């Protein structure tokens, strides 16, 4: 059994809502800002739908033509697709997976840069994260005002919580670096201990 890609999961979840064609799926993913959590490109989405068909997780519903536009094929989720979607979501919810993000690697190696540069770079990161958080908070306020149940944007709430936590941690860490509470190699105050072999 081939694992579903994040885009495959998103496509299958859309088909679980109702039958649709890939262009409509693409528009919905962008409109719902799913591109924050899934890399969404039209060509990749069509390829993901093809893979769902090959695996028997989706089926052709029909073909339609509107005016002089090209024909569009609509797809629907199969019973196997519903089962696979549910199983995949359950596994992802229950089992933590190290996705090897790059930022912790950069943090682990930031001692290779001068202290002033790290302070500046982390400050720039905080500013970008604050801008993203402000945008997300506007989305959450808008969803609440429109009466959209939180269940449908709980992932956005999760992202906001992660952003708040990262901003708080980075702000404190930058302050520690700037004050010298976190000694820096270029200050001569910290040396890396050699481990005995």
Predicted regions and their residues:
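DHp/HisKA dimerization-phosphoacceptor four-helix bundle of two-component histidine kinases
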Residues: 17, 47, 124, 158-165
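Basic helix-turn-helix/winged-helix DNA-binding cores
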Residues: 1-98
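Amphipathic alpha-helical dimerization/coiled-coil segments
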Residues: 86-134
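Short, contiguous alpha-helical
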Residues: 160-179
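Non-transmembrane amphipathic alpha-helical segments
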Residues: 122, 129-143, 163, 170
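Long amphipathic alpha-helical coiled-coil segments
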Residues: 178-192
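Acidic interhelical loop/turn segments
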Residues: 137-156
């Amino acid at each position: 059994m081939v694992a579903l890609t994040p885009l495959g999961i998103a496509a299958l979840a859309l088909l679980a809502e109702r039958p649709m064609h890939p262009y409509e799926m693409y528009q919905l993913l962008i409109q719902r800002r799913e591109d924050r959590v899934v890399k969404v490109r039209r060509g990749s989405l069509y390829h993901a739908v093809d893979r769902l068909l090959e695996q028997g997780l989706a089926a052709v519903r029909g073909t339609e033509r509107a005016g002089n536009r090209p024909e569009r094929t609509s797809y629907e989720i199969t019973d196997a697709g519903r089962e696979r979607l549910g199983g995949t979501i359950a596994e992802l919810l229950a089992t933590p997976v190290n996705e090897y993000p790059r930022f912790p690697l950069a943090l682990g190696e930031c001692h290779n840069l001068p202290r002033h540069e790290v302070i500046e770079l982390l400050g720039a990161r905080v500013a970008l994260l604050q801008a993203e958080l402000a945008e997300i908070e506007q989305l959450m306020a808008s969803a609440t005002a429109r009466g959209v149940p939180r269940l449908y944007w709980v992932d956005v709430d999760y992202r906001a919580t992660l952003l708040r936590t990262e901003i708080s941690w980075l702000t404190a860490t930058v302050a520690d670096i700037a004050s010298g509470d976190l000694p820096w190699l270029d200050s001569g105050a910290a040396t890396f201990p050699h481990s005995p072999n």
